[in-house]
Amino acid sequence: MLKPLGDRVVLKIEEKEQTVGGFVLAGSAQEKTKTAQVVATGQGVRTLNGDLVAPSVKTGDRVLVEAHAGLDVKDGDEKYIIVGEANILAIIEE
């Protein structure tokens, strides 16, 4: 299993028509974004005074992420992307 560092997040992209709260996203929005599930998160980032700021997302969250963000990686037969937390646009609440 992949364990990201810092503010990075491992995502599994959902390969289906994107919906947010039951609404199907318009074609142009689907081209600019992807829906994904958070598989793992890094520990967060340190502030200048050394405090640790934890990630805003947690394992299991469904998120909307920029379509071209991140690095494609493979772990066994599974495909994932690793993104910085700043590339996650929203948490999808069901």
From Swiss-Prot:
Pfam families from the UniProt entry: Cpn10
Subcellular location: Cytoplasm
A cellular-component GO term for this protein: cytoplasm
SMART domains, alphabetized: Cpn10
Keyword match Chaperone: yes
Listed GO biological process terms: chaperone cofactor-dependent protein refolding
Xref: SUPFAM superfamilies: GroES-like (SSF50129)
Record keyword Cytoplasm present: yes
Chain coiled-coil ranges: none
Matches recorded under NCBIfam families: PRK00364.1-4 (NF001528)
Function as written in the Swiss-Prot or TrEMBL entry: Together with the chaperonin GroEL, plays an essential role in assisting protein folding. The GroEL-GroES system forms a nano-cage that allows encapsulation of the non-native substrate proteins and provides a physical environment optimized to promote and accelerate protein folding. GroES binds to the apical surface of the GroEL ring, thereby capping the opening of the GroEL channel.
Subunit-structure text: Heptamer of 7 subunits arranged in a ring. Interacts with the chaperonin GroEL.
Full protein name: Co-chaperonin GroES
